[in-house]
Amino acid sequence: IPTIFVLGQDFSTEDYYNRILDGGIRDTDCPTWVNLLKLFKQAEIDLCDCFFSNAFIGLRKTTSMTGRFPGYKDVHFVNRNLQYLNFQIQIMKPSLIITLGKHAANMLYRLSQDDLHAWKNYNALRLPDEGYKEKVRIGNVCSSCVALEHPSMRYANLRRRAYKQYTGNDAELAMLGDALSCFAT
């Protein structure tokens, strides 16, 4: 079982998904995957140790791949997705949960409001030294959590990241390094 749970917001649009199925494009060529694979290589994260999921199940019926998932407006839909996310975490018992972007971080915050209280209102990405948390309780699971900028917008947003004495890409690499060393020992 993978030890790292990587949480995005959603998969994409129906059109994008259908183009992948038709062989017109490869998902790994999109900015999200290109930038994520580069970061994970820098952080020495083995993809075989990772399970990739999304906070929201389903595809967008819109043309835009970015921004808040349209289903966010439906409280019942959000709650069902939170239940499913919690179920996945309880089954996997990951040592590390990595969120991609503010919306995924906000969904994880909703499962552990006491331990991730600083992540409320998307502060996991805004405030210095708040993107990495150890010993986060989610149900019966205790994990380290790292909130990363969404890979598709990574280079536009990295300037705001700060952790310890590091900024930008170095800050996110330091958070990942601390999280990995925390459960490697």
Kindly give the residue locations of the regions a language model identified.
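A structural signal for short, well-ordered beta-strand segments and their strand-loop junctions
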Residues: 4-6, 46-54, 96-101, 147
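Short, solvent-exposed loop/turn segments at secondary-structure junctions
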Residues: 10-14, 56-60, 102-106, 150-154
